[in-house]
A protein has these predicted regions:
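Extracellular jelly-roll beta-sandwich "head" domains, especially the C-terminal globular C1q domain
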Residues: 1-139
């Protein structure tokens, strides 16, 4: 599944990037509601677990009324940011965009569900544009 949000959006501290359009639909083990920041992964498998690769790419900036400094974004599982997926940039001015990318493998136990999202882990609000989230069932 590939979901995107092309338009610039302000993402508040500890909130999720919202995805508005589905470019490529997933299968029955991946679901997303348009306008939501959550993707549900389902452990539909005969094995012990289902494995997914979750990749995010997008452009980040400090809003016009924000304070210039480091900004960051992370992938989150069930609402908890995964530290190893944190992408950090330090713009020199407001509305100066940087491109970031991060990815993770997520194992979902058989017959369970997890949610994944892209979370603003900065100390201030951020701008996100051309957000692209790809979720692939790999095993």
């Amino acid at each position: 599944m590939e979901i995107i949000a092309v338009a610039e959006q302000t993402v508040l501290v500890n909130q999720n990037v919202l995805f508005t359009d589905t470019v490529t639909c997933g299968n029955c083990s991946i679901s997303h509601r348009s306008g939501s920041g959550l993707v549900t992964l389902r452990g539909i498998t005969d094995q012990c677990r289902a494995r997914f690769k979750v990749s995010f790419g997008g452009n980040l900036a400090v809003p016009t009324d924000g304070t210039v400094g480091p900004i960051s974004i992370s992938l989150a599982i069930n609402g908890e940011a995964v530290a190893s997926t944190t992408a950090i940039v330090t713009p020199a001015a407001v509305e100066e965009y940087f491109n970031v990318f991060t990815a993770i493998f997520v194992d979902v136990p058989r017959d369970c569900c997890l949610t994944v999202s892209v979370r603003n882990t900065s100390e201030d609000d951020i701008l996100v544009q051309n957000a692209n989230l790809i979720v692939e069932r790999v095993a």
